[in-house]
């Protein structure tokens, strides 16, 4: 089954929550609770100590930076971005940034067998990859 994600933009959903992305939800909470802690990473779930605990404002800023960088690279709405990363705070924020940019995240576990990784990359057809 093919799904044209570009045609979903501006499409009206029946319920208000169906029209929101994760990025939209984080922005809304950021407006009302900017300094509340949003994300806490367990030891080993973040590469940079500054990512250990983030407020909604900080998480939204990082996700926006990712979104702007991806769009500045020439990607367009609906393009696939491969995430070849371990589970981490940074990878989670990258997924949110990808969604905010109107792109499609294709997460791929780096612990998978190389032949399966190659097959999944071929299937996803990413325009760009984020690798940790």
Residue ranges of model-derived segments:
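Anion (oxyanion) recognition and catalysis
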Residues: 99
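Conserved AMP-binding/adenylate-forming core of the ANL superfamily
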Residues: 18, 35-96, 113-118, 122
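Structured binding elements
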Residues: 102
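Active-site phosphate/pyrophosphate- and oxyanion-stabilizing loops and adjacent acidic/basic residues
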Residues: 27-28, 118
């Amino acid at each position: 089954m093919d799904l044209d994600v570009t045609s979903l933009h501006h499409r009206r959903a029946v319920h208000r929550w169906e029209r929101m992305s994760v990025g939209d939800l984080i922005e809304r909470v950021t407006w009302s609770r900017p300094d509340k802690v949003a994300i806490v990473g367990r030891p080993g779930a973040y590469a940079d100590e500054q990512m250990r605990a983030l407020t909604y404002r900080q998480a939204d800023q990082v996700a926006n930076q990712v979104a702007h960088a991806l769009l500045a690279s020439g990607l367009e709405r609906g393009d696939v971005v491969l995430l070849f990363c371990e589970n981490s705070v940074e990878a989670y924020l990258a997924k949110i940034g990808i969604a905010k940019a109107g792109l499609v995240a294709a997460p791929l576990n780096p612990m998978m067998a190389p032949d399966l990784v190659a097959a999944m990359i071929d299937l996803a057809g990413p325009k760009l990859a984020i690798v940790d």
